[in-house]
Design a protein with these regions (language model features):
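Internal gly/pro-rich beta-alpha loop/helix module
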Residues: 170-242
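ATP/NTP phosphate-donor binding region
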Residues: 34-131
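Boundary of Sec targeting at the N-terminus
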Residues: 20-22, 27, 31-33
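Short Gly/Thr/Asp-enriched flexible loops that form oxyanion-binding sites at enzyme active sites
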Residues: 143-165
């Protein structure tokens, strides 16, 4: 029988993993089962890996932080919901067809509204990506994030991530329980972009409502419309059509490997 992404990633949450490890008091940071394996990053985050990864597909790590894309509320409604309710596996499973274009590894960094994202979360994201980027089996990264501070997080990561591999941020304006929720398509397009060779070396990008924006330039321009982001001064970088990127612009500012910023030894910002 086919194994869904939720079964691969969501069946065992990071909380359950850590509890199991504490109970067993195991000195081994890597464990396996018939369907999945997982290991810990240096910061203690659990990376869940399907044992059914396809060798002919690129591999994308999805780092979930919460936000509206993981929100839940009254069925059909786009307001009065609680952010950060769904875990990373459930999010990936909602993006129909995504396992046909990439192997997905799930990492639950936190599960909060973006107003509650801290500089410690920023540093954890940067250092986790920098660590995992050394794995030749991982081709790109996607971060799911709340929209209120997504542009701030993308700016920070654009300066502190040290890899040429694609790093894509996305979110949603409607919670998962809303009619025509926008999160699944945003996530699908983001994973497709992160898995694409054309996206290498372009810095941190934001994908929203099929648009591709530079992490340094993107701004939130609406609190209600699904087309909620734009790059007013420099313009967008491109757009997505059914998982295929079309670029017409590039980042002109120093980013990622070109910057002098190093947060590897920090736990909080000065």
């Amino acid at each position: 029988a086919a194994i869904t992404a939720a079964a691969m990633i969501s069946t065992i949450t990071p909380t359950m993993i850590f509890a199991q490890e504490q109970e067993e008091k195991s000195e081994n940071s890597s464990q396996t089962s018939d369907e999945y394996s997982f290991y810990e990053t240096k910061s203690g985050l659990s990376v869940t890996v399907s044992n059914n990864e396809k060798e002919d597909l690129p591999t994308v790590a999805v780092l979930a932080t919460g936000g509206t894309i993981a929100g839940s509320g009254t069925a059909g409604k786009a307001t009065n919901y609680t952010a950060g309710q769904l875990d990373v596996g459930t999010l990936v499973d909602s993006a129909a067809g995504v396992t046909d274009i990439a192997n997905v590894r799930g990492i639950q960094v936190c599960n909060v509204g973006s107003d509650d994202i801290t500089d410690e979360n920023w540093i954890t994201l940067a250092n986790t990506i920098n660590e995992l980027a050394q794995d030749e089996n991982i081709d790109g990264f996607v971060i799911t994030h709340g929209t209120d501070t997504l542009d701030e997080s993308s700016y920070f990561l654009n300066l502190t991530v040290k890899t040429d591999k694609p790093v894509v941020m996305t979110g949603a304006m409607r919670p998962s329980t809303a009619t025509s929720a926008d999160g699944p398509m945003n996530l699908y397009q983001s994973i497709a972009l992160a898995a694409n060779e054309q996206a290498k070396g372009k810095g941190v990008m934001v994908v929203f409502s099929d648009g591709i924006y530079g992490g340094r330039d993107v701004q939130k321009i609406s609190t209600c419309q699904t087309d909620a982001f734009d790059s007013k001064d420099f313009g967008g970088m491109g757009y997505m059509v059914d998982g295929v990127p079309y670029f017409y612009n590039d980042s002109v500012k120093c980013h990622t490997t070109e910057t002098e910023f190093d947060v590897s030894s920090l736990k909080e910002l000065p």
